[in-house]
Curated annotation (Swiss-Prot):
Uppermost EC category: transferase
Pathway(s) per entry: Cofactor biosynthesis; riboflavin biosynthesis; riboflavin from 2-hydroxy-3-oxobutyl phosphate and 5-amino-6-(D-ribitylamino)uracil: step 1/2
Family stated for the protein in its record: Belongs to the DMRL synthase family.
Sequence positions that bind (2S)-2-hydroxy-3-oxobutyl phosphate: 86-87, 128
Gene designation per UniProt: ribH
Higher taxonomy: Bacteria, Pseudomonadati, Pseudomonadota, Gammaproteobacteria, Alteromonadales
Protein's UniProt name: 6,7-dimethyl-8-ribityllumazine synthase
């Protein structure tokens, strides 16, 4: 039986991190967690990490698509924070962001790691950006590193 799986270390990986500026007090912590994880666990060099900042979560898929289309990156991490308010706006933003990022991954055959928080409260977002519930930016980076290696292993074995 052949089992294909990836590891975390990926020294030569070129990674783009597409980041929403909206709710920056949360998203900046996600970005720090992602970059720290890429460097410490993935051994990714500074020069192989590119950060692209966009206004909000709705803009993440378009920026990710442009990054994927250039063909210079092995993977993309999308980071943002969508916090529920008193209107249905949350559902539209969160859903379209998720759907758009998944479409980019499938269209361009590139891993796109979803590090966009979708929470009911500001407190939940803060907990998930480096306090009680860990750092979801770091978790998104770990997932991306593994998928970069899984796809490389598949290419070699299939």
């Amino acid at each position: 039986m052949n089992v294909v799986q990836g590891n975390i270390e990926s020294k030569n990986a070129k990674v783009a991190i597409v980041v929403s500026r909206f709710n920056s007090f949360v998203v900046d912590s996600l970005l720090n967690g992602a970059v720290d994880t890429l460097k410490r666990f993935g051994q990714v060099a500074d020069e192989n990490i590119t950060v692209v900042k966009v206004p909000g979560a709705v803009e993440l898929p378009l920026a990710a698509r442009r990054v994927a289309a250039c063909g210079k990156f092995d993977g993309i991490i999308a980071l943002g924070a969508v916090i529920r308010g008193g209107t249905p706006h949350f559902d539209f933003v969160a859903g379209e962001c998720n759907k758009g990022l998944a479409q980019v991954a499938l269209e361009f055959d590139i891993p796109v790691s979803f590090g966009v928080l979708t929470t009911d409260t500001i407190e939940q977002a803060i907990e998930r950006s480096g306090t009680k519930a860990g750092n979801k930016g770091g978790e998104a980076a770990l997932g991306l590193l593994e998928m970069v290696n899984v796809l490389q292993a598949l290419e070699e074995q299939l």
